[in-house]
Amino acid sequence: TLHVFELMLTSFIAGIAFGGLWVRKQADRSADPLRLAGWMQIGMGLAALLSLLVYGNAFDWVSWIMGALDRTASGYTLYSLGTAAIAIAIMLPAAFFAGTTLPLFTVTLLRSGHGERAIGQVYAWNTVGSIAGVFVAMHWLIPVLGLKLALITAAFVDMGIGLFLLRREAQNRPQLMRTAFAALGVLLATSLSMTVVQFDPLKMASGVFRTGSTILSDDAQLIFYRDGKTASVSVTQYADARRLIATNGKTDAAINIHGKPASDEPTMALLAALPLAMHASPEEIGVIGF
């Protein structure tokens, strides 16, 4: 978990930094920084949609990496580098475009005569928006729509903001035409993301990061899969009536309905029974495990 967090944070901060570095001179030279911000918003949304394609294929890439490497210390180092490169490819492009927007909005306000106070205002609203975005994504978008549609929705909102800025700043017919073509591109990219990009639940539940295989056994049947606030949970049933509950592909619990109980089944049964013993009619039960 710590390794995943540091990869995510590194990719995001690096993307923001590189985006800010690139736009540093572009913002000063731009005659209309707000219009440039509109193009950056569209670029951010397109990069987010592209990340869906990378993510959907990441499981096969990890399987190939694990199959090509030996189970040694040096092999693990190469595995870590390979998976880090995949994670960076997923997150950094969209973060790059995100890093360009705040400087452009700041320059726009400064040119409009708002003074240095505009810098604090831009970053304050950015903080508020970040908090609101996390709250909406965690408590509504991902649980209700699932990971794929949640990302597509967020990307579409980004691109919609970009199109609004382009239309607002359009001063002549060529700019209006470019905005119209951009709108068509946004609709096409969104449609392709919904129809072409596939998140295969079987691959996501395979635990490829642990097993090196994206394929469950022939007698396995995926009977439940859902993206939650912080993890994706799956339930797999096998021909011998075993059922496995996995979190992000890692099996956390199993039960054999008709056969001999597994060694940890009493522990799992106790975890379910204890809350019921402590409360007559519980409405919500939280289980914390390690």
What are these regions (language model features)?
Residues 1-290:
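Alpha-helical transmembrane segments of multi-pass membrane proteins
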